[in-house]
From Swiss-Prot:
<protein>
    <recommendedName>
        <fullName>Serine hydroxymethyltransferase</fullName>
        <ecNumber>2.1.2.1</ecNumber>
    </recommendedName>
</protein>
<comment type="similarity">
    <text>Belongs to the SHMT family.</text>
</comment>
<dbReference type="GO" id="GO:0019264">
    <property type="term" value="P:glycine biosynthetic process from serine"/>
</dbReference>
<keyword id="KW-0028">Amino-acid biosynthesis</keyword>
<dbReference type="GO" id="GO:0030170">
    <property type="term" value="F:pyridoxal phosphate binding"/>
</dbReference>
<comment type="pathway">
    <text>Amino-acid biosynthesis; glycine biosynthesis; glycine from L-serine: step 1/1.</text>
</comment>
<feature type="modified residue" description="N6-(pyridoxal phosphate)lysine">
    <location>
        <position position="226"/>
    </location>
</feature>
<dbReference type="InterPro" id="IPR015422">
    <property type="entry name" value="PyrdxlP-dep_Trfase_small"/>
</dbReference>
<dbReference type="InterPro" id="IPR001085">
    <property type="entry name" value="Ser_HO-MeTrfase"/>
</dbReference>
<comment type="pathway">
    <text>One-carbon metabolism; tetrahydrofolate interconversion.</text>
</comment>
<keyword id="KW-0554">One-carbon metabolism</keyword>
<dbReference type="GO" id="GO:0035999">
    <property type="term" value="P:tetrahydrofolate interconversion"/>
</dbReference>
<comment type="subunit">
    <text>Homodimer.</text>
</comment>
<feature type="site" description="Plays an important role in substrate specificity">
    <location>
        <position position="225"/>
    </location>
</feature>
<feature type="binding site">
    <location>
        <begin position="121"/>
        <end position="123"/>
    </location>
    <ligand>
        <name>(6S)-5,6,7,8-tetrahydrofolate</name>
    </ligand>
</feature>
<keyword id="KW-0808">Transferase</keyword>
<keyword id="KW-0963">Cytoplasm</keyword>
Amino acid sequence: MEHLKTQDPAVFEAIRQELGRQRDKIELIASENFVSEAVMEAQGSVLTNKYAEGYPGRRYYGGCEYVDIAEDVARDRAKQLFGAAYVNVQPHSGAQANMGVYFTILEHGDTVLGMNLSHGGHLTHGSPVNFSGIQYRFVEYGVREDDKRIDYEAVREAAKTHQPKLIVAGASAYPREIDFKKFREIADEVGAYLMVDMAHIAGLVAAGLHQNPVPYAHFVTTTTHKTLRGPRGGMILCNEETAEEFGKKLDKSIFPGIQGGPLMHVIAAKAVAFGEALSDEFKTYAKQIIANAKRLGEKLQAEGVDIVSGGTDNHLLLLDLRSLQLTGKVAEKALDAVGITTNKNAIPFDPEKPFVTSGIRIGTAAVTSRGFGENEMDEIGELIALTLKNIDNEEALNSVRSRVAALTKTFPMYPNL
């Protein structure tokens, strides 16, 4: 980055310091990951210069013959990864992928059944402060209070009562496997469409480690980062059942409906990431993500930290801090101060406000990319517990900092940057 260093020292320094943060801290935010240098090279390429409104072979600009190749490669690889008949890789984010589906099949005020945000859902699944909750009439389903798992019978009853046009499955803070087949059965019973937002688990689905929603859902949306380990972006997929009826409508909803020109440098980076995800090495990586999450959860429980639902089936864990008399806000700050990055997160039936919360969410995708295994999960679990139990003990916290530094030095990040 010699040109940037000379031309804009302020931005260069911000990037340099962020690289240092990623190298020196243990990244446990469940929605984050470390992409390959090949993905970063594609995203930082000359494709950022090219406007390409439209779709391959149907552009509103000339000179698109090479960006067409990149987009076709991305679409073909995504179809292969997930067994989809239709793919749109142009959404700039997961939120815009969701918006594209909503705009395709819903009218203002239509009823939609989605997961309660505090039970693990997402802002775009009907939060009243989000466009989804403003534009449409969302009703909520959630988890049982006793075991914190989705209550499918309650989902069925809510669907029968409210007769939604669309049911949304998928979550941003739900640590258990979701039964998409059961969701489709419920949708069929009430004549609703089913959309699955698999943003958090897409990499696990691609590796065959979680039920694939594509055969069951009318529409599947995802981000391309998180467990899929690509650039930040979104994507829509459909199976053969709905591709013929809705493919062109979905394309029009994205462009010209809610977006203009696609980000061709990001789409190229998506293509690279999808190629990586097709490899045997990625399958091994995804298996390790889950093994690490399970091991970390077991260690935290052994250290006396409560885990929502008692464990995990995927990459994330939700910690209930009430028994430690801590809030998520306090815990996030304390952990960050010793070099462990997490995020405060509401737990089901949380008595605290959304900016305070009673929990923190952690995930293992990024640390697994770094090379951490189950032995490192034991140490991280111990370090988290030590921190949470000794928030005012500076001697104990300094010991944690030293151990974090030793651990991160053992597994260097981006040594060539």
